[in-house]
């Protein structure tokens, strides 16, 4: 089989952890996508993976990726953002940019490889957030965008069955570059950790281990699910 597993956001906390776990599990057919050339090149070189430098916010970005990879076994769209503002300060552009990053570009990726995924009975893994299921102040932008991602995942799971599985992971706050503005403050970080029943901040590997399971045939009888990886935050806190 010539196809590969695509990891979008491969230099982020979850994406890079997923690349590591796929390598550790013996998968060498992985293609990484990131806008950060030096970082993605280093990760790809470390594991012997192929890669494309591409920015998902650019028009027609999938064409650049398809030059490097035509055939896909699965897609993990490990891209997210933390857009926090009081609602009275939120602009239409804030919503548009967040929707483009989290929803529209994921749609473009799936459409670009839909036929390959169908042929290979592949899998799509999308990412949401715990903020969709538990109200947090200042989260209207990202919660709205990720709620749309969940709707997309469930709808496509129904439409694509039985040939393509589609699932969604909903993490709580994860230790990552985009979370550092909050986590660099020790008191804030400790407060956030205590708000979770499991009393810690998530790590990239927490969501990545589930992503690996959902991306591969280990989860061949699972589709249309939104699964929380949130230390119990959405249900128990």
Description of each model-found segment:
Residues 11, 19:
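N-terminal Rossmann NAD(P)H-binding glycine-rich loop of SDR-like oxidoreductase domains
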Residues 86-87, 91-99, 189-192:
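Substrate-binding pocket helix/loop in short-chain dehydrogenase/reductase
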Residues 115, 157-162, 220:
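Alpha-helical segment proximal to the catalytic Tyr-Lys
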Residues 123-148, 153-161, 173-174:
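Catalytic loop of short-chain dehydrogenase/reductase
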Residues 134, 212, 223-237:
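Short C-terminal tail/terminal secondary-structure segment
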Residues 166, 170-181:
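Short, flexible catalytic-loop segment of classical short-chain dehydrogenase/reductase
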Residues 196-207:
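A conserved structural motif in NAD(P)-dependent oxidoreductases
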């Amino acid at each position: 089989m010539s196809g590969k597993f695509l990891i979008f956001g491969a230099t982020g906390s979850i994406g890079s952890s997923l690349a590591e776990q796929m390598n550790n599990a013996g998968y060498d057919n992985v293609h990484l996508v990131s806008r950060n050339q030096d970082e993605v090149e280093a990760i790809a070189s470390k594991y012997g993976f192929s890669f494309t430098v591409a920015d998902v916010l650019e028009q027609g970005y999938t064409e650049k990726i398809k030059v490097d990879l035509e055939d896909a076994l699965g897609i993990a769209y490990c891209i997210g953002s933390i857009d926090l503002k009081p609602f009275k300060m939120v602009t239409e552009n804030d919503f548009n940019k967040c929707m483009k990053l989290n929803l529209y570009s994921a749609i473009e990726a799936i459409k670009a490889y839909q036929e390959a995924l169908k042929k290979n009975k592949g899998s799509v893994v999308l990412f949401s957030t715990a903020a969709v299921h538990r109200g947090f102040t200042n989260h209207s932008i990202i919660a709205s965008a990720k709620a749309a991602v969940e709707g997309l995942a469930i709808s496509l799971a129904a439409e694509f069955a039985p040939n393509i599985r589609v699932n969604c992971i909903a993490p709580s706050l994860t230790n990552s570059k985009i979370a550092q503005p909050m986590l660099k403050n020790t008191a804030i970080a400790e407060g956030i950790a205590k708000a979770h029943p499991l009393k810690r901040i998530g790590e990239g590997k927490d969501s990545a281990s589930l992503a690996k399971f959902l991306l591969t045939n280990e989860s061949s009888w699972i589709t249309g699910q939104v699964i929380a990886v949130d230390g119990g935050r959405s249900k128990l806190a």
